[in-house]
C-alpha cells in the first residue's frame, strides 16, 4: 500500500530539525502521542522547575498545526515559557537554526545535503532530524466540480510547462471530460511558492522534476491554497490533506490513465 501511494505523490514524511540543546528542551513531546508505541527505554519526562524563556519555530507551513499543538502542550507544563511559530516554508528552517533565530525548524521534506553541511559548519555537528509524522498531499477542486478523479500525467499536463510525464497541455476543463459550464472554462491553478517543501515535493513527484507553468497562482500557505480553490469553482490546487475543508473536494489519483484511482483520506 505504501509503495503504491508513494508512486502517486501522496505520502511524505515530516521532520523536525533542531540543535542538540533544542532537542533536550522539547523531549517530552513523545508523551503526547499516547496512541503511538513509545520506546520503553525512553525515560519518563520530569518537569524542570523554574524553566522560562522563549521557544521559536521557523519552517514548514504544513506543520504549523502540529507545532502550535506541541507548543501549547509545552506551555501547559511551563507557564513562564513564551512560544512563537512562524510558517515561512521548509527552506527557511535550517537558516533560522543556523542564525540562532529559532530553536526548531519543521520541514515537510528531507533536509538537503547543502543545508546539513551549512549547519555542521556552524555548529560542528549535524542537526538532529526527528521524523514526526506522515502527511498526505492531495489535489483539490471546488466542492461543486463534477470531476472525481485524475491521473498523474493529467496533473503534470495541468501544472507543468515541461510535461515530463508525456501528456499534452491541459488548460481547459473540457480536456478533462467536463461538459456544460465547465467545458470551455480555463483551469485556474493554485500552488505554493518555492520556499515551501510542499512545492518541492509536488514538483518532484507530480511533475517529474519538471517546471511549473507561469500561470500557477503561488500562495503563501496551505490554508491559502484551499481558500482559493474553495472560492473558485473552476480552480484546482494542491495542499496537505489536513487542510481540507467542506468547500473543496480531494480528487482520487491514478498513476496512469485507465488505472485504478486511489482516494485520499486522512484516516
Annotate the PLM regions.
Residues 1-4, 26, 33:
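N-terminal amphipathic/basic-hydrophobic helices that include classical n-h-c signal peptides
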Residues 33-267:
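Flexible loop/hinge segments at secondary-structure junctions
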Residues 2-19:
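Bacterial N-terminal signal peptides that target proteins for export
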Amino acid at each position: 500500500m505504501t509503495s503504491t501511494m508513494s508512486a502517486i505523490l501522496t505520502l511524505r514524511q515530516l521532520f523536525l530539525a533542531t540543535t542538540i540543546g533544542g532537542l533536550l528542551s522539547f523531549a517530552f513531546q513523545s508523551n503526547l502521542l499516547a496512541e503511538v508505541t513509545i520506546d520503553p527505554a525512553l525515560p519518563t519526562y520530569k518537569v524542570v522547575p523554574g524553566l522560562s524563556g522563549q521557544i521559536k519555530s521557523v519552517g514548514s507551513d504544513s506543520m504549523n498545526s502540529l507545532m502550535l499543538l506541541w507548543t501549547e502542550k509545552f506551555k501547559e507544563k511551563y507557564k513562564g515559557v513564551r512560544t512563537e511559530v512562524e510558517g515561512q516554508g521548509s527552506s527557511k528552517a535550517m537558516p533560522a537554526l543556523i542564525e540562532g533565530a529559532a530553536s526548531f525548524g519543521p520541514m515537510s521534506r528531507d533536509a538537503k545535503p547543502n543545508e546539513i553541511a551549512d549547519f555542521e559548519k556552524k555548529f560542528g555537528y549535524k542537526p538532529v532530524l526527528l521524523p514526526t509524522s506522515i502527511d498526505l498531499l492531495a489535489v483539490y477542486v471546488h466542492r461543486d466540480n463534477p470531476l472525481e478523479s485524475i491521473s498523474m500525467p493529467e496533473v503534470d499536463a495541468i501544472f507543468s510547462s515541461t510535461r515530463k510525464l508525456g501528456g499534452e497541455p491541459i488548460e481547459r476543463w473540457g480536456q478533462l471530460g467536463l461538459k456544460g459550464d465547465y467545458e470551455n472554462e480555463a483551469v485556474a491553478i493554485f500552488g505554493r511558492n518555492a520556499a515551501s517543501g510542499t512545492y518541492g515535493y509536488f514538483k518532484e513527484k507530480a511533475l517529474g522534476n519538471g517546471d511549473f507553468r507561469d500561470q500557477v497562482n503561488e500562495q503563501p500557505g496551505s490554508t491559502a491554497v484551499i481558500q482559493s480553490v474553495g472560492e473558485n469553482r473552476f480552480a484546482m490546487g494542491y495542499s496537505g490533506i489536513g487542510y481540507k475543508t467542506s468547500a473543496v473536494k480531494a480528487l482520487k489519483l491514478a498513476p496512469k490513465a485507465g488505472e485504478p484511482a486511489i482516494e485520499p483520506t486522512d484516516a
